[in-house]
Amino acid sequence: MYDDEDEMVNDPMDGDYIDDSDEISAEAWQEACWVVISAYFDEKGLVRQQLDSFDEFVQMNVQRIVEDSPPVELQSENQHLGTDMENPAKFSLKFNQIYLSKPTHWEKDGAPMPMMPNEARLRNLTYASPLYVDITKVVTRDDSATEKVYDKVFVGKVPVMLRSSYCMLSNMTDRDLTELNECPLDPGGYFVINGSEKVLIAQEKMATNTVYVFSMKDGKYAFKTECRSCLENSSRPTSTMWVNMLARGGGGGKKTAMGQRIIGILPYIKQEIPIMIVFRALGFVSDRDILGHIIYDFNDPEMMEMVKPSLDEAFVIQEQNVALNFIGARGAKPGVTREQRIKYAREILQKELLPHVGVSEHCETKKAFFIGYMVHRLLLAALGRRELDDRDHIGNKRLDLAGPLLAFLFRSLFRNLLKEMRMTAQKYINKNDDFALDVCVKTSTITRGLTYSLATGNWGDQKKAHQSRAGVSQVLNRLTYTATLSHLRRANSPIGREGKLAKPRQLHNTQWGMVCPAETPEGQAVGLVKNLALMAYISVGSLPEPILEFLEEWSMENLEEVSPSAIADATKIFVNGAWVGIHREPDQLMTTLKKLRRQMDIIVSEVSMVRDIRDREIRIYTDAGRVCRPLLIVENQKLALKKRHIDQLKEAADEANKYTWSDLVGGGVVELIDSMEEETSMIAMMPEDLRSGGYCDTHTHCEIHPAMILGVCASIIPFPDHNQSPRNTYQSAMGKQAMGVYTTNFHVRMDTLAHVLYYPQKPLVTTRSMEYLRFNELPAGINAIVAILSYSGYNQEDSVIMNNSAIDRGLFRSVFYRSYRDNEANLDNANEELIEKPTREKCSGMRHSLYDKLDEDGIISPGMRVSGDDVIIGKTVALPDIDDDLDASGKKYPKRDASTFLRSSETGIVDQVMLSLNSDGNKFVKIRMRSVRLPQIGDKFASRHGQKGTMGIMYRQEDMPFTAEGLTPDIIINPHAVPSRMTIGHLIECLQGKLSANKGEIGDATPFNDTVNVQKISGLLCEYGYHLRGNEVMYNGHTGKKLTTQIFFGPTYYQRLKHMVDDKIHSRARGPIQMMNRQPMEGRARDGGLRFGEMERDCQISHGATQFLRERLFEVSDPYHVYVCNNCGLIVVANLRTNSFECKACRNKTQVSAVRIPYACKLLFQELMSMSIAPRLMVKPRQSKRSKHQSEA
């Protein structure tokens, strides 16, 4: 049945003979688009971009890196004798096929065990798979070669991304996952490194191999063309070439009369080279020849005029060798012969200049054409015929995901491995003329390198940590399920956070549908940290070879065979930035290319093809990191998506050979479009726009649903299109801090911190996108009954009044888990660690805490109630036997206490204790403590519209206002919270929620949905006998009198946020002080003081409150006594026991004064003295009161 239908889809005559009954009506569209979206998420999920990228890395990149590495070639060098050996043995090692097995853990006894992710989390292991490679060893002795193949040599471990195809959990059913203690809803897409979950954040960068023209505001250059060229999957760093046009009068000197010259900046060459000299160095000598490569049409006087100054400048140099010498002299180190300089210049032109065009011999023509194209673009921009490029256009950006990031790392680590291998093998060869392979492969290089970067987030070599990028790998946010999803779809721009540039932070038009417009952090990173929109996908990259072969067949003319004059009328073709040829029939070519892509034949669906008709260019991109999104294909103003597709998707839920998203892509119904191609498409917002008589009759695509422009966090907001935009941004940040159920297996996990809400509810008012975020299964909030009124004044300034009785029934009650961990580290035999119960007889340094809560094995037992500073894990460290380790009492202790204590500010119950062995085979404990958190005054709550507030007071139900029906609100918020913030969505949500509660079905609040509006909701509410705008008559709870106004009243979804008073309350009278300056410590965790800062000081000075000032800044901070010599004013040596003083500077022992200054001041004086600056304290003799009176008299 399906086969003939598929043929119908692919039939080009499609639109003509199928009758209109198969079209989707406007009413059915509301459902149809969600069927398509569901098909997308069923197949792709929300973290597909991470998983695909990692799979690409393992399946393709690793193999490519290993194969591309040159063989290790060695020969025995005679060490001591001066004579050379006649024919030393030659050795060569070549790497072939690689293998990655399932994640494995080797126990200390050496037995390999398959490892599950949860075991890795609990035991602080790294979830990694061993990597094996086949090595061929060729030994040549006396002209006879012997070859030996070593199968599957272990070279290191590669961390595995959860749920990728190499993970144990891939393709498991929910039942299997549950048996493994994994959450079936967990999306994967992260790594487990030493027991902690790490995400790789996508890194934004400018696209390589593309020509950009920028104008320079006020510099030496008027325009600058750059091409950052980089060979696909090679280890070479990018080499950038610039072609710049000097500003008028720029470049100084007498040449200004000549006009604007064009110069090139080549890699490894210190000075700028006139562009004509570069052409001559490439072997194009005559002026006409060069101009042909730059200006394709000689009948263009303006452009000819622009290049004239450059021709005049290079007039002196006419042959290729002179030009090469000119370039070589400006790069090579001085004092080399002319031949060497020419050779050096040739080498640079071949290998370093524009490597993506070619690095082999005889690429001169291609390179000349490409440089000519760069100059041509520069001239077009200078003449104002083509607009400048936009740095912030998302099509000019690439996102590096796990794949490219890990490939970059693996490439350098593998190179190091080869280096170490060569050195070790050379040693063995010199000693005994042969070597064993397994001794030379240092497996820890790759293992440690990958683990280090993923664990710390410093992306690059450990030794050069300061140059590497920081924060590439982050600990996965596990506060709420939403926070987890959002973290896995984040992208980061590596621009300094300090820069005040507004441009890169602004929302760019091209980000529509690719980047969420609401979800970005507030503060310094605003706009630099982005989140992907729901249906955005990032290309993993494919090989350009099939496309190049196809173009060859389809009459593309190669640059080597083209005469420059032919280029003017033809269309240039670029593949991944490299100019590969020209074509005479661009229209036909594009149609064929698109058709092939829609049939997924030769061309992969994620390849993008752009035809720039005005500039006569066709650009084809197959590289990784382009952001793209699916759109519905429109042909002849009709959707390619028909009713039958929808029916097939609907009924496919249970069949084995079901109709899926891939079939839609393969059937030419939807396609992936990146933002470059989007610019050349005409996209309808809704299928209604395709009706005839619209403002456009050449639509090429149609949006699936406009709500898909939002990201994970913004998709939870009901009616976001009725809120002021910053409010949606605030909610996107707060939704990540709401409490809920963050994963269904939280009881078997040992997370450092975890909050779980007691009775989470799914919202009464939902958006359609929520079902893909699993918000209904793992919600983070409660439908509270909310009244908006000012009642008693305890809800001013964004505070809320809560119903105490509702809290007693469990409203917003949550449980808080915190884990503590410790292990016996065996550093060396001298100080051996033991987990045991410390005793006061044997241990020094024991605190005044309760050690008796510990069991005999030194670990507290589950169910114990613990409070601040109690011991949870007893641990002792053996002290080495030295005699000077005596205590003040003169007692010698064999051990020192190293126990773990509960945080001083917390109380709770020991929930779970886990004993295990860690990766080193040492004993290892994790203890989870739980405490119940009731909502209390000062805790933070928020609705889903950025309306956050703290609890101001709790009233019993009797004191709350009530409606005529006898309903009392759970929460009362202040009316002043709404008007100035314009969160109308909040009010509509309340109205819709009221209707839903009456109607008994979930309300729809999907954005950009015109079918739901206030008029309709109000009309339906009226039918249930309520006021049409949701107002109700209420009675004062204290007096029973009717309130004079009607109150807006109904259910609203509220979230409890993680900021709780119990975690913040802090005060200090006396406490610990810092070693260095003897001032109080900082921070609540260290029982620190509250800083009386510069601004506070300035206020007290302006008050003139000197005694208070002295007390704060001196008496209660760091008072100190110093003794000062009266003669020279320097600090003297004082011995208070014998009461003897001596000034070392002037040998004075009697004239000494005691001075009280802050200890920090004393420290400053001594630091100044160490720099040979003498701060002298000049002291006056203190007058007695009597002498004072006499002097006044």
UniProtKB/Swiss-Prot annotation:
Enzyme class, UniProt record, top EC level: transferase
UniProt xrefs under InterPro entries: DNA-dir_RNA_pol_su2 (IPR015712), DNA-dir_RNAP_su2_dom (IPR007120), DNA-dir_RNAP_su2_hyb_sf (IPR037033), RNA_pol_bsu_CS (IPR007121), RNA_pol_bsu_protrusion (IPR007644), RNA_pol_Rpb2_2 (IPR007642), RNA_pol_Rpb2_2_sf (IPR037034), RNA_pol_Rpb2_3 (IPR007645)
Any idea which UniProt keywords this protein has? Answer: DNA-directed RNA polymerase, Magnesium, Metal-binding, Nucleotidyltransferase, Nucleus, Transcription, Transferase, Zinc, Zinc-finger
Q: Does the keyword ATP-binding apply?
A: no
Pfam families given in the database record: RNA_pol_Rpb2_1, RNA_pol_Rpb2_2, RNA_pol_Rpb2_3, RNA_pol_Rpb2_4, RNA_pol_Rpb2_5, RNA_pol_Rpb2_6, RNA_pol_Rpb2_7
Which subcellular locations apply to this protein?
A: Nucleus
Q: Where does Mg(2+) bind?
A: 798
For binding Zn(2+), which residues are annotated in this chain's numbering? Answer: 1125, 1128, 1143, 1146
Q: Which terms under GO biological process does the entry name?
A: DNA-templated transcription
PANTHER family in the record: DNA-DIRECTED RNA POLYMERASE I SUBUNIT 2
**What other remark does the UniProt record contain for this protein?**
The binding of ribonucleoside triphosphate to the RNA polymerase II transcribing complex probably involves a two-step mechanism. The initial binding seems to occur at the entry (E) site and involves a magnesium ion coordinated by three conserved aspartate residues of the two largest RNA Pol II subunits.
- How does this polypeptide assemble, per the annotation? Component of the RNA polymerase II (Pol II) complex consisting of 12 subunits.
Q: Which protein family is named in the record?
A: Belongs to the RNA polymerase beta chain family.
In Swiss-Prot or TrEMBL terms, this protein is called: DNA-directed RNA polymerase II subunit RPB2
